[in-house]
A protein has these predicted regions:
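Active-site acidic catalytic loop and adjacent metal/ATP-binding pocket
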Residues: 22-32, 37-43, 85, 121, ...
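Short, surface-exposed acidic
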Residues: 12-17, 252-260
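Juxta-kinase regulatory segment immediately upstream of eukaryotic protein kinase catalytic domains
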Residues: 1-14
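Short, solvent-exposed segments of well-ordered alpha helices
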Residues: 51, 195, 233, 258, ...
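Charged, amphipathic alpha-helical linkers/stalks
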Residues: 307-332
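ATP-binding pocket architecture of kinase catalytic cores
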Residues: 16-149, 155-168, 184
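Active-site activation/catalytic loop segments of kinase-like enzymes and analogous catalytic loops
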Residues: 221-254, 265-286, 293-310
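C-terminal amphipathic alpha-helical interaction region
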Residues: 323-358, 363-444
Length: 444
């Protein structure tokens, strides 16, 4: 079984096993050896591995094993099990809570050390890494570098997307193809999801860059777009001057247009599995957090598109909030918050119960305001397409078709998509409040 395999890596007996509070399943593990010494590990599991998947725990394990021999700080891989699709990493000292650092100057020093680690990563000799078998062929054109991971996501989720209509995903994917970079400085190993909270720090120094399951060959500018996105979700003092510092350290030219492009690429690529998760009953992971990622993320994508295209976007008026609340759903939410949450001792159980409370609150708002939000969206689509657009599902289908056929100009379409996203973020406010008042940091 899994636990005997984990214990054998000590070797010894498991003296600590605690569920880590995170979106993906992970466990804090201590293995006590016969001589009394303790191996401190971090166990990651992939319970639903997919063949030929471009995002995987196995990929992360291989990258960490390779990078241990470089000057890019990563957790050591202590063991990988093909049988259990499990990886045991060393538990690196440090904190990931960069937003919680209350000294702006220290926050800045940490981010500068981090950007140095990313600069070193992007300058590594690819042949010496011997990762081609795991990561596949390297991109041979700028378009392949920019679109390879997006195309892999579209392929991986083809069955879901065949029956799922979302105008922002459709427009975003098309936009990325239209505006893909025509030249890049080089192909690098990119982390693919890098930035605040995906690295640990001690003092003012990065102790480990973590979460490598998205790692791949690509344009180094992609990671700068990733940093924009992660700083959006995890505000850490802004980005002013950091990308210029990256250029000085790496010798790789930075452009504002590249950062604008790749923050949209990161969002569109990342939103495909998030939309899929939000459509999945009985999701093993936290639906509340996925709803937050979806609706805050969709709004941020629209704002990034507006910025890249010089299109002004703004929130529309929201529905009347005077409609009576659902007595049953309000009572359920209050019971979870008032009576059950205080009685739970496990941090993981408390986290999941709070997630359930958020879902109940979202259901209550959906019941009160969902129809009004969808009606407003139908009116917007009708004005744009100059046609009658009811019911809602039919209106969305007509918009998706118009986008695919390129019958709508960019500016009014981006503005419509933004109004839709603002309304949906408002509708799912209890989930969106998990990441309150998130805004893009200014770019160099």
């Amino acid at each position: 079984g899994l636990l005997p395999w984990v214990a054998s890596l000590g070797p010894g007996h498991i003296s600590r096993l605690e569920r880590h509070v995170a979106r993906r399943e992970a466990w804090v593990v201590d293995i006590t050896r016969g001589d009394g010494s303790v191996l401190e590990g971090f166990l990651r599991l992939d319970r639903e591995p997919a063949a030929a998947r471009n995002v995987s725990l196995q990929r992360e394990a291989a990258i960490c094993r390779t990078l241990t021999a470089t000057d890019v700080p990563v957790p050591a891989l202590l063991g990988w099990s093909d049988t259990h699709h499990a990886a045991l990493f060393s538990r690196v000292p440090g904190s990931a809570d960069l937003p919680g650092v209350d000294d702006p100057q220290r926050q800045r020093r940490i981010m500068e050390d981090f950007i140095g680690a990313i600069a070193r990563l992007h300058c590594l000799d690819l042949d010496s890494l011997e990762l081609d078998e795991m990561l596949g062929a390297r991109p041979s054109t700028p378009a392949e570098a920019a679109l390879g991971d997006l195309d892999a996501q579209l392929h991986a989720f083809a069955a879901f997307l065949k029956h799922y209509q979302d105008p922002l995903l459709g427009y975003g994917a098309g936009w990325l193809r239209r505006f893909a970079p025509r030249q890049i400085a080089r192909v690098s190993l990119v982390q693919g999801d890098t930035g605040p909270v995906n690295f640990l720090f001690e003092g003012d120094r990065v102790s480990a860059v973590v979460d490598w399951e998205w790692g791949h060959w690509g344009d180094p500018m992609e990671d700068l777009g990733n940093i924009c996105v992660r700083e959006f979700w995890n505000p850490s003092g802004g980005l002013s001057g950091l990308f210029e510092r990256y250029e000085q350290l790496s010798g790789i030219p930075y452009t504002r247009a590249a950062a604008q492009y790749y923050r949209i690429q990161q969002n569109v690529r990342g939103m495909i599995p998030i939309h899929a998760a939000c459509s999945q009953p009985g999701l093993r992971e936290s639906m509340a957090w996925y709803l937050s990622y979806r609706y805050v993320g969709d709004r941020s994508t629209c704002e990034a598109l507006g910025d890249a295209m010089n299109v002004a976007v703004e929130a529309p008026p929201m529905p009347d909030t005077s409609k009576d609340r659902s007595v049953l759903l309000a009572a359920a939410s209050a019971t979870l918050q008032r009576d059950i949450l205080p009685e739970l001792g496990s941090p993981f159980a408390r986290s999941r119960l709070n997630d359930a409370r958020v879902l109940v609150a979202c259901a209550e708002r959906e019941q009160r305001y969902g129809e009004a939000v969808r009606a407003a969206c139908c009116e917007d689509i009708g004005r744009l397409l100059k046609t009658q657009t009811r019911p809602y599902e039919q209106a969305i289908g007509q918009l998706v078709e118009a986008i695919a056929e390129e019958r709508v100009a960019d500016e009014p379409l981006i503005q419509l998509l933004a109004r839709k996203a603002y309304r949906e973020e408002w509708l799912y406010q209890p989930a969106a409040a998990l990441y309150p008042e998130r805004r893009w940091a200014a770019l160099d």
